[in-house]
Amino acid sequence: MGQKVHPHGLRVGVIKEWDAKWYADKKNFADNLVEDHKIRNFVKKNSYAAGVSRIEIERAAKRIKLNIYTAKPGMIIGKGGQGIESLKNKLQKIVSNKNILINIVEVKRPEADAQLIAENIAQQLEKRIAFRRAMKQSIQRAMKSGVKGIKTACSGRLAGAEIARTEHYNEGTIPLQTLRADIDYGFAEADTTYGKIGVKVWVYKGEVLPARKNINEKEEANA
């Protein structure tokens, strides 16, 4: 079966960073992991309309720092910073005896962010927009923004069909096996009257590590 590995997980430590930047011993590791999961779920649910792409969590002794990457930072920050204070107070109830710092990072090109594209397609499916139209429009916007390639997939009872199926659309190149290829991946679910529809998006943004490649070429030329 042609199952695909998660593109981010495959590249962690090669060209991608960890989303959780902390160390814990055996005694505290499980608690921290569950806490991270609760934090991510809460922020996603609470700020879904703001288009949260990803959440980085850094931990020190009694401090947790969240880097929230969002397409609409104003919606999270709120008027005079009220929104961010409200979010911090709610998160404080989930995390006991720890100070929370929240850093908002703006996603400059939301039309080229795989997670935001997937969520956008899912929202359109919930509004009963045809899945082909939703996918093709997202692909066109992404290609206009300058990405090298994009692939989208919708799985489930598409258009209310009795039998569930998967439909793919792609444009450009998506080198999934090339580790130096910067592949962004996003997943979202649409809750329709016929059940859930899963949306997956792969975006190829170009190769990373060009400097190292040039150094190797110079060394070969000098040899």
Curated annotation (Swiss-Prot):
GO terms for biological process: translation. SUPFAM superfamilies: Prokaryotic type KH domain (KH-domain type II), Ribosomal protein S3 C-terminal domain. One of its GO terms (molecular function) is structural constituent of ribosome. Keywords: Ribonucleoprotein, Ribosomal protein, RNA-binding, rRNA-binding. GO terms for cellular component: cytosolic small ribosomal subunit. PROSITE patterns: KH_TYPE_2, RIBOSOMAL_S3. InterPro entries: KH_dom, KH_dom-like_a/b, KH_dom_type_2, KH_sf_prok-type, Ribosomal_S3_C_sf, Ribosomal_uS3_bac-typ, Ribosomal_uS3_C, Ribosomal_uS3_CS. It comes from the Bacteria. Pfam families: KH_2 (PF07650), Ribosomal_S3_C (PF00189). Residues 39-108 form the KH type-2 domain. Binds the lower part of the 30S subunit head. Binds mRNA in the 70S ribosome, positioning it for translation. Belongs to the universal ribosomal protein uS3 family. Part of the 30S ribosomal subunit. Forms a tight complex with proteins S10 and S14. This is Small ribosomal subunit protein uS3.
